[in-house]
Amino acid sequence: MDKKFIRNFSIIAHIDHGKSTLSDRIIEFTNTLSKREMTNQILDSMDIERERGITIKLNAVQIKYHARDNNEYLIHLIDTPGHVDFTYEVSRSLAACEGAILVVDAAQGIEAQTLSNVYLALENNLEIVPTINKIDLPSADPERVKKEIEDVIGLDTSDIPLISAKTGLNIQDVLEAIIKHVPPPLDANDDAKLQALIFDSFYDSYKGVVCLVRIKQGTIKVGDKIRMMANNKDYIVSELGIRTPKIVNKTELVAGEVGWVAAAIKTVKDINVGDTITHANNPADKPLPGYKKILPMVYCGLYPIDTSQYDDLKEAMAKISLSDAALTYEYETSQALGFGIRCGFLGLLHMDVIRERIAREFNIELILTAPSVIYKIELTNNQEISIDSPAKMPEPTNIKAIKEPFVKLAIITPDNYVGAIMELCQSRRGSYQDLEVIDGTRRRLIYKMPLAEIMYSFFDSLKSITKGYATMDYELIGYQAEKLVKIDIMLNGNKVDALSIIAHRDFAYGKSKIICERLKEVIPKHQFEIPIQASIGSKIIARETIKAVRKDVIAKCYGGDVSRKKKLLEQQKEGKKRLKAIGNVDVPQDAFVKVLSEN
């Protein structure tokens, strides 16, 4: 096929602006799938994606479209996630394209992640085609949104498609805009040395790891000996093809095409997303510009509530990590919770999705320890180490400084909530950077804030004070030294490692008090008094006491000498003292679940 009839594009948007629904309508309009084969969110392959109405894994399909100019075009569509946690998925798909459709909600207008995705597209030199969706809503105001797109992003909206992905209104206008504005891959040459960009991978129990690729140059065929340029590993191509979104086998993929390649690769860890595939016997001179290695932002310990399921949890993590390149994990033990796994996630939604997949696909209920970020510790001997858990914190005497990650936080909000949001950000150690006007009623607030503060229910608080109208987006900007301390929680004088946290010194007392109070509520009474203490080093900063259960030892004394009663009470007192010295505090699992889930 002549390269001028090929188009490669992504759909980008803020979460819930209708990307996946638009993908459905395009697939339906072009008869890529029959009516019987169509389901809602056809490109969202996981049940969790369909139930939550979000896209987590990106997906790619090949579509044939007979345009108004009477030519048939080969269009490769890549659907992308919209949530901030999965920005890395968006950046991967954009590198495989020449253009992007920017979907904007006709009622909501431009939101936080609309802008961050636009910047990603511009970084990849993509042609952006704006599209206004949901024009069938009673609250839709396409003219206002057009003005926003022109003023805030600077895109021309004179011939912008106005569509309803839900009803299928004006879907052909989107396809025509793609043909008109997205450039074809004219520099692609079938006879050049092979350069194929891996923009995603997934695990298939029969094929092994399947790579989703964009063939930039050259041709790849079944039986070819290929090489991964990042690690110089060689494989033989066993199968390849395209997705429609059904898996369709082919004998070759040529320059300009988007498809999949299987080569008996054992695990996803053998594949670097962003790597370049070339021929082993005639390799390309240099790899394509790849991606940055994905680094987890949030760490958390996962422990099975039923400790006998630890081996099942190990197996579950191994299987899930086969198809999730961003998930990292290592085994750990806790004196309080037993054997578990410490995992690195892209963000809290990613963490929640993994927890739900383990519960649903493997029937394992989990306790999650308090999420933590990566701290950089400067030691007194001038070494620098990174820790992802309070348990790994060195002794205070060995620490020169503790640095924590900071983010640039952008919040788009109706102007009547600006004051409340500024108060929230300041209470979370945020420092004000900028305030931009988007239109007559909406503002964009920029704050610099510690990542750790965003993790603890910040998004819930933001939604609560703005009645759900504010949207946010953040990006990591670096590390900064802060007055941070490790808070240990002790029960009856013994440290409980699972409850340790790292906090700012100014907020340490408040957080400690809350944890101690919650523990007092959930730990049952024992026959001896239990002190619950929070400490920084050897200094106790908060305390609660669980009173002892009193057994009435003098109930059997009817009258008689008072010294008899005193003797029995004295014996009880001695017994309790002995019990307190040697007795272990029995903390039920649900107490940990309650304290950690609310922490």
From Swiss-Prot:
Its main location: membrane. InterPro entries: EF-4, EFG_III/V, EFG_V-like, EFTu-like_2, G_TR_CS, LepA_C_sf, LepA_CTD, LepA_IV. One of its GO terms (biological process) is positive regulation of translation. It is a peripheral membrane protein. It catalyses: GTP + H2O = GDP + phosphate + H(+). It is found in: Cell membrane. One of its GO terms (molecular function) is GTP binding. The keyword Oxidoreductase does not apply. NCBIfam families: lepA, small_GTP. Belongs to the TRAFAC class translation factor GTPase superfamily. Classic translation factor GTPase family. LepA subfamily. This is Elongation factor 4. It comes from Ureaplasma urealyticum serovar 10 (strain ATCC 33699 / Western).
